[in-house]
Amino acid sequence: MSSMHALAPSAEYPITDRNRLKRRHDRGSYDRCSVHAILDAAMLCHVAYVIDGQPFCTPTLFWREGDMLYWHGSSASRMLRHLKAGTPACLTVSHLDGLVLARSAFNHSANYRSAMCFGTARIVDDPEEKAAAMRAVVDRFYPGRSDALRPLTGQEAKATTFIGMEIEQASAKVRAKGVADDEEDYALPIWAGVVPVRTVLGEVEPCPRLIDGVAPPPELGLYRAGRSLDEGLTEAQHAYEEG
Amino acid sequence: MSSMHALAPSAEYPITDRNRLKRRHDRGSYDRCSVHAILDAAMLCHVAYVIDGQPFCTPTLFWREGDMLYWHGSSASRMLRHLKAGTPACLTVSHLDGLVLARSAFNHSANYRSAMCFGTARIVDDPEEKAAAMRAVVDRFYPGRSDALRPLTGQEAKATTFIGMEIEQASAKVRAKGVADDEEDYALPIWAGVVPVRTVLGEVEPCPRLIDGVAPPPELGLYRAGRSLDEGLTEAQHAYEEG
């Protein structure tokens, strides 16, 4: 784990014009751990890409393996057809953690964690990498589950396209604090405070057509009712990485 | 409210190559009500824009007035400097509503609501429109609150830039149902079901420096503990529209 090890990735992503934070430097960082923690707490990301000068912002499920990001969709989708040759993309994850009501309009804010990742998105066409992605898209979220499923058919494999992108640059941005008013405003008789926001899991709704006696699988324990989705996804990522 | 009224906006956004759904047509629509409902339930969006061929995907707070979308940031921000001349943008909102575990990898899915809006983003430089935005950025989320705040200073107004974009095309996409397995897979002894996901508000954390006797304002009632953020934001939008 020493950063002196020749093969260890450096602690920070390289900083270029693409990912350099242009404002609120106090909220930002470039280190891998911060970026990965924000990514691993999410299932949904937004990917920006360009077709003929027109930007598109597409929401999609994604997952991370080291510095690789993967997402998937039908080979018919607009984005994927255009990505075949490899195209610059920006994948962003954001978590809204709180509403911040201040004593002035200017100091109203939100608590959040976000990560922006830059790279070149490419279709995964290597058969081994694609087979691994077919398992990962299930097992990253539900560790061990792919072994228990009905095996993939050849037709399903053909109809599935995965996109892979190595993170070339990235940045993380976090606001996680209370009201930050101008010093003289604290004396005003105006209410200020934070409303926390949390994304939580509800009671599982089993499929009404379950075969009698089929018990909930162990991976469902990660997503028990009342837990944060964040926590469940982060724990699932760790379990997935440990194999 | 009749669609025969000459001045009423048509029920659907025009369909062009930009917003035409390329897959899962069964989940999509182009009607204003569906798109607006998804937007109005959110505070956070992701905006895609392009600088020198490089796509950026930026998370930001936003709000809607009719078919106009607004978001804001420091005039120093990368996005805004490049948007001054007006630039194509795509603003997307997504809500994750559930994890869908099926009997095959292929039928794993998520419940979600998303809206993609296309248009030309421009700096709001008309003084009246900017003054209105200064109030709206507070009042859309906290109806009536801007009147109770310490007034904006000239320096704050100068340091604030708003972006406006009229929605030229848009689409909505929704998955809101249970497991959809292949018919023959329902006979398999594999667990399947849905884990609902909800974004909820926590107990308010008042600023520790509140002046004695300052009571929580009425607009905070929209964001009471245990309520969905969705619901609070949707109700706030209605209150804001009713003035």
Role assignments for model-derived ranges:
Chain A
Residues 13-70, 81:
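An N-terminal domain-cap segment
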Residues 1-19, 129-243:
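C-terminal edge-of-domain segments
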Residues 5-10, 75-136:
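Short, structured beta-strand-loop surface elements
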Residues 43, 67, 85-89, 113-117, ...:
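A generic structural signal for short beta-strands and their flanking turns/coil linkers
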Residues 68-70, 90, 173:
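General beta-strand recognition
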